[in-house]
Amino acid sequence: MKSSEAVKYLGQFVLNEYNENIGIVIGYVCNGLGDVISFIVSLAGEINEIPMDRFVISGTRIVYLSSISYEFKNLIEKLKAVNLRINSLNKLNSDNDINKEAWERFKLKVETVYKEVINEFNELKKRVNSRIQELKNKEKVLDEALIELKMNYIENAISKENYESSLRMILNAKQRIINELDQLNKIQNYILSSENTDVIEVKVIQ
């Protein structure tokens, strides 16, 4: 993205993956060629310089990826790239023009990278599981808060107006958790299904 194009995003809201406003674009940083390398965003009162690849931009909609979604996106790209190189390298195994020692050295480099990607996937899986458990615990707290609210309303300890306002906030918070859990479960299912195939498996190039 060029500087002249990025101008239209100044003052635009930044959304999270659940369509919530979390900040606003107040500027951007370019390299010497005028390519935008980062947005300057006000998030929760803090000024942050955020690399462009952390955003998904569609039209004037700017979505800031969570750390888990961002890492997942990058790992998928790495996995596709290394799988492509493995497939290409396998096809060169019987090529008489290729020096076998050079092929073996190249093979070792590719396999090393592949194992690093697999390790990163395993670490991501732990993070996803931890976040899912954290959200489920928050869900339990909200359920208890909902019971308390309804009991107070039954006992006439809260006005109807305040009750309805508080009820909306709790239900919105619960829906927010449901939305994030849904996304995390999709990531988790992708990783788990991949582990049952030869996609995420340390390959030995033949």
Residue spans for each PLM region:
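Peripheral interaction segments used for macromolecular assembly
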Residues: M1-Q206
